[in-house]
């Protein structure tokens, strides 16, 4: 193990000088024992100097401090010892429950599985959320993105998915909190504890208040733990909240590393950094990783380079809309913008496909008629269009649903709707079976039976 000295500190970026014959490799972990700080090598600048990112606060560092090269990249504990624990980017416990007691450690920088090892699946994963199961169904072993601006419900939707899938699914889950609020991580921990599934979840947090190095690498730490479970032949759920903060952390250190910024100030290596992470989130012939990732959309602009780069890697995209949220319809999923590769008659079946397409057609027609209604009013529409508008408004209302995780805010109990009930309800709406029921009966309802019951009470 060679030793060097700190020669420059610029925020999260630290330059360290080593003897010329013992320069560390890129991604090697260096340790400053006096400060208890780990650095990760990013560049070799020549003359024995390496440029590193600090995996913690660089406050109090000064030139001349001794740095030790560990000789390998950052390693984190993996396996069953991580379940029920909260760890930081280095795999150190932060839940005050004693040491992890790991049997094995993995390096966080690993190759993606080779093509012949990867497997594709068409098995559907039921979520119990009507709008998702209908228009953008998830695949087991697939990658899903929840796209939305600030405050439209990404985290609440993700928590509901965790509630519905992780509890029903007997497998293991890994939750990577990347640059999000500490409060949300705290709530998540207690929620898992209350529901009795804490012993099946490993949690890795690098919150908003942490230096960019932590936020840049914490997603890889969580992914490494998920890969271990997958390689043991298990089916794993990987939740990442929020993938945008991963990009943002890269942007924060990019300029300090001396790279020229690209579009909108993002790092020039944006696509490559996203690819390195996303290509590893995949299912193999031994086990599967099903990932759900929240993606913040800056200024509600889906063409921003960060969300646009993420789109390319996903099997299903759930787009949350501010306009739908402003109507009071939650989950605020846009059924016209959300897509899924699974929405194919050969995968979901002809009936499901026809109902989903029918719902989208009716909503699209309503969208086109809104301008005419705003200018001329409903009376100028043909009878056929009036029927379409009435059904579209009922469909819009019926796409809302009370969530289990929002019970404390809404006061109404959460509802889980099975896929067959979802299809039956929307099929009836399209065929005019429920034209006699007032649209208010459809708002925040579970299955169609509940809607009929409400209408009969009135």
From Swiss-Prot:
InterPro entries: AAA+_ATPase (IPR003593), ATP-synt_VA_C (IPR055190), ATP_synth_F1_bsu (IPR005722), ATPase_a/bsu_AS (IPR020003), ATPase_alpha/beta_chains (IPR050053), ATPase_F1/V1/A1_a/bsu_N (IPR004100), ATPase_F1/V1/A1_a/bsu_N_sf (IPR036121), ATPase_F1/V1/A1_a/bsu_nucl-bd (IPR000194)
Catalytic activity field: ATP + H2O + 4 H(+)(in) = ADP + phosphate + 5 H(+)(out)
Role played: Produces ATP from ADP in the presence of a proton gradient across the membrane. The catalytic sites are hosted primarily by the beta subunits.
Membrane topology term: Peripheral membrane protein
CDD domains: ATP-synt_F1_beta_C, ATP-synt_F1_beta_N, F1-ATPase_beta_CD
Binding site for ATP: 148-155
A Pfam match: ATP-synt_ab_N
Recorded GO CC terms: plasma membrane; proton-transporting ATP synthase complex
Top-level enzyme category: translocase
Protein name: ATP synthase subunit beta
UniProt organism field: Shewanella loihica (strain ATCC BAA-1088 / PV-4)
Family: Belongs to the ATPase alpha/beta chains family.
Alphabetized GO MF terms: ATP binding; ATP hydrolysis activity; proton-transporting ATP synthase activity, rotational mechanism
Keywords, ordered alphabetically: ATP synthesis, ATP-binding, Cell inner membrane, Cell membrane, CF(1), Hydrogen ion transport, Ion transport, Membrane, Nucleotide-binding, Translocase, Transport
Keyword Nucleotide-binding tagged: yes
Subunit structure: F-type ATPases have 2 components, CF(1) - the catalytic core - and CF(0) - the membrane proton channel. CF(1) has five subunits: alpha(3), beta(3), gamma(1), delta(1), epsilon(1). CF(0) has three main subunits: a(1), b(2) and c(9-12). The alpha and beta chains form an alternating ring which encloses part of the gamma chain. CF(1) is attached to CF(0) by a central stalk formed by the gamma and epsilon chains, while a peripheral stalk is formed by the delta and b chains.
EC numbers, comma separated: 7.1.2.2
Subcellular location: Cell inner membrane
Superkingdom assignment: Bacteria
């Amino acid at each position: 193990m060679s030793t060097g000295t700190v020669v420059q500190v610029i925020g999260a970026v630290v330059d360290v000088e080593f003897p010329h014959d013992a320069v560390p490799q890129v991604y090697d972990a260096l340790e400053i024992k006096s400060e208890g700080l780990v650095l990760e090598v990013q560049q070799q600048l020549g003359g024995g100097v390496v440029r590193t990112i600090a995996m913690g606060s660089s406050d109090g560092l000064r030139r001349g401090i001794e740095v030790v090269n560990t000789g390998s990249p950052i390693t984190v504990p993996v396996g069953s010892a991580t379940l029920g624990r909260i760890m930081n980017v280095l795999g150190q416990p932060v839940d005050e429950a004693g040491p992890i007691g790991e049997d094995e450690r993995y390096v966080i920088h690993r190759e993606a599985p080779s093509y012949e090892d990867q497997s594709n699946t068409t098995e559907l994963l039921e979520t119990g959320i009507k709008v998702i199961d209908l228009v953008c169904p998830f695949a087991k072993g697939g990658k899903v993105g929840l796209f939305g601006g600030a405050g439209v419900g990404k985290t609440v939707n993700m928590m509901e998915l965790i509630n519905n899938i992780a509890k029903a699914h007997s497998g293991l889950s890994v939750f990577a909190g990347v640059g999000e609020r500490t409060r949300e991580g705290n709530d998540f921990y207690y929620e898992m504890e209350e529901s009795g599934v804490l012993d099946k979840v490993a949690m890795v947090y690098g919150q908003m208040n942490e230096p960019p190095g932590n936020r840049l690498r914490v997603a890889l730490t969580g992914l490494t733990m998920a890969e271990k479970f997958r390689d043991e032949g298990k089916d794993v759920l990987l939740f990442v909240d929020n993938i945008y903060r991963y990009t943002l952390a890269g942007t924060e250190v990019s300029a300090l590393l001396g790279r020229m910024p690209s579009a909108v100030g993002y790092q020039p290596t944006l696509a490559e950094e996203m690819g390195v992470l996303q290509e590893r989130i995949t299912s193999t012939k031994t086990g599967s990783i099903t990932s759900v990732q929240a993606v913040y959309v800056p200024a509600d602009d889906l063409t921003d380079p960060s969300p646009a780069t993420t789109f390319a890697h996903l099997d299903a995209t759930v787009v949350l809309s501010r306009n739908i949220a402003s109507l009071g319809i939650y989950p605020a999923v846009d059924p016209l913008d959300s897509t899924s590769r699974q929405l194919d008659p050969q995968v979901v079946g002809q009936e499901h496909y026809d109902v989903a397409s029918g719902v989208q057609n009716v909503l699209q027609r309503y969208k086109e008629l809104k301008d005419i209604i705003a200018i001329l009013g409903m009376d100028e529409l043909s009878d056929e269009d009036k029927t379409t508008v009435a059904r579209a408004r009922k469909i819009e209302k019926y796409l809302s649903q009370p969530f289990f995780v929002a019970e404390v805010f809404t006061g109404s109990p959460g509802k889980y709707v099975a896929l067959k009930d979802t299809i039956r309800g929307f099929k009836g709406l399209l065929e005019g079976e429920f034209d006699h029921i007032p649209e208010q009966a459809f708002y925040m309802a579970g299955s169609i039976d509940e809607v009929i019951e409400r209408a009969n009470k009135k």
